[in-house]
Amino acid sequence: MAIHKPLENLYIVDLDQPLEGFYNFLNSWVYKKDGLTIAVDPGPRSTIPVLVEALKQLKVERLDYILLTHIHIDHAGGAGLLVKHFPEARVICHPKGVKHMVDPSKLWEGSRQFLGKVADVYGEIAAVPEKNIGYQNPVEAGDVVINIFETPGHAPSHLCYQIGNLLFLGEVAGINYPLDRALYLRIATPPPFIYEIYRASLEKAASLDVSHVCFGHYGYRKDVRNVFDTALNQLDNWLATVEKHIRAGSDPFDELVYADLLKNDRGLSLYYSLPTDVQSREKIFSVNSIKGMKDYLQNK
């Protein structure tokens, strides 16, 4: 288990999974200040024991809030189990996602269909008691104010949370891999993807006055402008590249699009600096993002 303290009051808990390349990929955030403790994206069921042990090491006896950026299994699947350990916790979730966290049967079924064995590794989504979950904006807890912003580009239930100068991004700006000062960024546009909504969500997040952005995948960055400029450029570049290959009738489509992106996309420029198993992981998720864009272009 690894716990990092990048800033005062802020901790990263690594949630590595027993899958190829699934390290430096998932994390949960813990924010502690003046007796208040907040967890952002507790992760899947499989690593709730890791998070609980981390909270124990951080001397957390009371968990006040669990903030869900969205209800995908890798971010929210373990929330119900975490509530069993901390029954006083209030789970904050987009209104569209509340019913799916109270009764996650359809969400679990969809996760298994979409992710296959990866969902099985993550573990079945744990139900959150209805009395523990809801939505309010802002959340005021003593001197701490949590402002919430709807950013539905990656998922309809996606939210970003601002606490002071920190912005918890979820996946609104994609996926970061820690490479010292250099930026590796990969977009997250799974089906169903709608370009206009995704771009508006990115622009909304980019407009906020913050000093650090905290990713659901993975870690944090303080070059905030660079992150959003790269993400916006990447969004438009990927869409244009996918459209070019649709018009050309490229086959095999995914392989040719991805090869093109590795040559022309600045967010992916450090792809070959990644460990080989992480490259394999990133290719799988990139192909899924390509599919989201292809479906959008063919159906609009």
Give each language-model segment a name:
Residues 2-57, 161-171:
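Conserved beta-strand hairpin/beta-sheet module of binuclear metal-dependent hydrolase folds
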Residues 244-300:
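C-terminal regulatory/interaction regions
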Residues 232-250:
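Charged, amphipathic alpha-helical linkers/stalks
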Residues 224-233:
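Histidine/acidic-residue-rich catalytic or RNA/ligand-binding cores of hydrolases
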Residues 40-43, 64-71, 92-94, 151-153, ...:
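Active-site neighborhood of phospho(di)ester-bond hydrolases with catalytic His/Asp-centered motifs
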Residues 48-94:
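Active-site metal-binding motif and surrounding structural segment of the metallo-beta-lactamase
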